[in-house]
């Protein structure tokens, strides 16, 4: 999880610990000792300059000089402690990752990297120093993330409860266009009559799921109030529906057939003709099969490709089946025992080369040999299907919300703890007096 972010450059520079030495001055001195580190007067002066520039650009008022200096000093002390935590944990940010972060900063602020360099220079901050400060900020953030995450415990019940609340809030604004068939239990009906009616409702539901026209079925069989409109109830929110309808609708999507379900007057079948305002998450799952040949000292890349091409020819000619070839040759024991089948999976679970194949291959077509980190493969897509993952997405959203809430709470507590446990000696405060903490 990224908990370090880069807003507008002016805001970013305000938040950063600017350990940048200004142009040489006659006297630079240690203002505070922080465990094994120090805060220099030049650090404070540079940070004060940055804060004032940012405030001026945004038209924000500032407190008096003494209060502002105290706030800046405290920020520098806490940042120094966090940097020391990162060093103790052995966190290092390499140049590749640093350059990626700098490019992200520029993009998020609609700048090129060159414009970002010009911006920092215009604020009196040498780009090289700014660059290293970003490196320190990322390292400190990683240390904070690692330490705080250990303190967070999210219970499954919390996720379920919040996910349910989010779903209810979403449902409150959702509109459904529904159609209805009612099979009425007549007065004086015997138990046999009721059972026959239930069987008829089940048969109708099955026919509808197989594609029968709902309006035709409603005209023919329904005894409900909208039978002469083909069962069409139009657009409604759940709160506007009869309770027996609303109780059955739990987030189903367009064209869903619901039922049959029983009420005091008989059996009911619903169809959701359309939905407005419902956030659904569908993913494509692929059932593929493959044959894997691993390279070794006795099996070269060329040899693996030749073997797989021979297997393809034998399968296409009808001499062999894919299943038999997978059992005989595949070096993926898990799938080989299942005729090479991998079962329904989302493509993202596979390595990039395999993912590309199962996403792009037409169903029933065997791929040419291709290489992954595991070896050489041929693959065939047997089936694709769309799977509703709305519930899972809602739970993931609930988990992220809980994580962010608890992270912010625990991060504040953690910062207070490391600040309290650090040795901090302010050598001269605003009154010129020494202060030990």
Curated annotation (Swiss-Prot):
The keyword Signal applies. The keyword Zinc does not apply. It is found in: Periplasm. Coiled coil: none annotated. The gene is surA. One of its GO terms (biological process) is protein folding. It holds the Pfam family Rotamase_3. Residues 1-22 form the signal peptide. InterPro entries: OMP_Chaperone_SurA, PPIase_dom_sf, PPIase_PpiC, PPIase_SurA, SurA_N, Trigger_fact/SurA_dom_sf. This is Chaperone SurA. Residues 173-274, 283-383 form the PpiC domain. GO terms for cellular component: outer membrane-bounded periplasmic space. Its EC number is 5.2.1.8. It catalyses: [protein]-peptidylproline (omega=180) = [protein]-peptidylproline (omega=0). PANTHER family: CHAPERONE SURA (PTHR47637:SF1). Its main location: periplasm. GO terms for molecular function: peptide binding; peptidyl-prolyl cis-trans isomerase activity; unfolded protein binding. It comes from Aliivibrio fischeri (strain ATCC 700601 / ES114). Keywords: Chaperone, Isomerase, Periplasm, Repeat, Rotamase, Signal. Chaperone involved in the correct folding and assembly of outer membrane proteins. Recognizes specific patterns of aromatic residues and the orientation of their side chains, which are found more frequently in integral outer membrane proteins. May act in both early periplasmic and late outer membrane-associated steps of protein maturation. The PPIase activity resides only in the second parvulin domain. The N-terminal region and the C-terminal tail are necessary and sufficient for the chaperone activity of SurA. The PPIase activity is dispensable for SurA to function as a chaperone. The N-terminal region and the C-terminal tail are also required for porin recognition.
